[in-house]
Amino acid sequence: ALSSAASDVYKRQIVRRSIQMPTIPYYGIMEGQVGYINLSSFSGTPSKDFKNAFLDLKKQGATSLVIDLRNNGGGLLDQAVEIVNFFVPRGKTIVTTKGKIKQASNTYKTLREPLDTDIPIAVLVNSGTASSSEILSGSLQDLDRAVIVGNRTYGKGLVQVPRSLPYGGNLKITTSKYYIPSGRCVQAIDYAHRNEDGSVARIPDSLTTVFHTAAGREVRDGGGVSPDLSLIHIS
């Protein structure tokens, strides 16, 4: 029962159940025929939702596209590859995972014909953009298919695999690192080198390595995806 300040009592029955949050909370046309898609996660089937939203925006006359990945913590790797495939040709290597065992090493390529290889794209990112979101934004940057706008991303370049435990529990085990088209890994924290107290730190910029995009632009590994255009605040 719930009571108010006036001591009225309201009785409500609440049913506990699973709720599927939308992967695309909003999409629409902005001024100047700019299409906008807010992609909040990579759980479920976001590539299907994204495709439907994009095709609808095209019908409405969108001539350019903004993909908002701010605070998107990631999810399924293959879903990020699917969305990249909408904008780049078939047969492109998007992600390579490398682990200590053969089963943890894989290559993910674009397998289908794209939806649109010409529409101008801007991707919004911030420090909450992580994992599969960095695969999407970093791959589009490496292939010179989009302009990345905002702040440096989180820097999660590791792949975890869930293992079932008794009593319905799960344990996530890190099995590999992932590498995007330029060959770089965006992992920011160097777990291989710990401080005396056992803590770990981010890889300093001075120790990062230069890689190159398809058009020859310099990009760096470590520390996430750095934007092409840095903005302190995006409203």
Residue ranges with predicted function:
Residues Q13-I14, G99, T175, D190, ...:
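Short clusters of small/polar residues that mark proteolytic maturation junctions
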Residues S182-L231, S235:
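Conserved functional hotspot residues or short segments at active or partner-binding sites
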Residues D118, L143, G168-I173, S206-T208, ...:
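Active-site lining segments that contact anionic ligands and/or coordinate catalytic metals
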Residues Q20, Y179, V225:
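Short loop/turn segments at secondary-structure transitions that flank enzyme active sites
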Residues V125, S133-S137, L165-G168, I173-T174, ...:
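Functional cores that coordinate and move charged inorganic groups
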Residues S3-P166:
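Cleft-lining beta-strand/loop regions that shape enzyme active-site pockets
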